[in-house]
């Protein structure tokens, strides 16, 4: 089961832009709890605490128990907005979670054994094409990461969604077999491969070309005794 974090909030008696600005001036972030067939509940959260939660990472995949007027509300953040200049939170939305609820979330990918991949050892670079996978899972069992083992990838090879083992109960939303990771060759690698192939082909052709004169010489040698015999007569 995913770890549930605690978060304190205060009910907002008023909504609207003016009330939201007043909350921000008081050092609080306006927000709302909605969903689970219940009316929306305007709230406010202390700005320093919310900022700390956001900066800690994985905010949008963390389940919270919000304490509000003596009651706890099981929620998950669905969106937040930051000030475009000062980069502090100015609004937050929470989705209320009912018992046994499932949810769609985006789970980050964590790479395993990237340093031992054959393609990396030959000078390639790991390119994480997709940083997170959209999945559906139980709200109480959201994985922190989806692990992708790239330890066997050769140069120019890729790891796809079908190559990754998802945790039990986690279903991908994508229908196509997406490319998650590729090993990108270093600059000039394609030319080196072509040059090596050309050299190998030339090396194979050289003995065949050298065999023709030998056959001709053998034929000439076969005629020599006949000519010599005529002279002896």
From Swiss-Prot:
Part of the 50S ribosomal subunit; part of the 5S rRNA/L5/L18/L25 subcomplex. Contacts the 5S rRNA. Binds to the 5S rRNA independently of L5 and L18. Keywords: Ribonucleoprotein, Ribosomal protein, RNA-binding, rRNA-binding. The keyword Ribonucleoprotein applies. It comes from the Bacteria. One of its GO terms (molecular function) is 5S rRNA binding. Residues 1-23 are annotated as: Disordered. This is Large ribosomal subunit protein bL25. This is one of the proteins that binds to the 5S RNA in the ribosome where it forms part of the central protuberance. It comes from Nitrobacter hamburgensis (strain DSM 10229 / NCIMB 13809 / X14). GO terms for cellular component: cytosolic large ribosomal subunit. One of its GO terms (biological process) is translation.
């Amino acid at each position: 089961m995913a770890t549930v974090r605690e978060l304190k909030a205060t009910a907002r008696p008023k909504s609207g832009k003016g009330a939201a600005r007043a909350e921000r001036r008081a050092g609080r972030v306006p927000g709302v709890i909605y969903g689970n067939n219940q009316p929306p509940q305007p709230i406010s959260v202390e700005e320093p605490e919310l900022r700390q939660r956001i900066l800690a990472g994985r905010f949008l995949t963390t389940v919270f128990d919000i304490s509000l007027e003596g009651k706890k509300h099981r929620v998950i953040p669905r969106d937040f907005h930051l000030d475009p200049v000062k980069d502090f939170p100015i609004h937050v939305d929470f989705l209320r979670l009912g018992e046994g609820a499932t949810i769609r979330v985006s789970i980050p990918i964590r790479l395993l054994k990237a340093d031992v991949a054959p393609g990396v050892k030959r000078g390639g670079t790991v390119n994480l094409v997709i940083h997170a996978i959209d999945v559906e899972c139980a709200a109480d069992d959201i994985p922190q990461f989806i692990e992708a083992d790239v330890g066997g990838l050769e140069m120019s090879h890729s790891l796809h969604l079908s190559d990754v083992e998802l945790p039990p109960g986690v279903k991908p939303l994508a229908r196509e077999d997406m490319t998650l990771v590729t090993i990108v060759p270093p600059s000039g690698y394609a030319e080196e491969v072509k040059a090596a192939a050309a050299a190998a082909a030339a090396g194979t052709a050289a003995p065949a070309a050298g065999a023709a004169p030998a056959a001709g010489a053998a034929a000439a040698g076969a005629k020599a005794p006949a000519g010599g015999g005529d002279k002896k007569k």
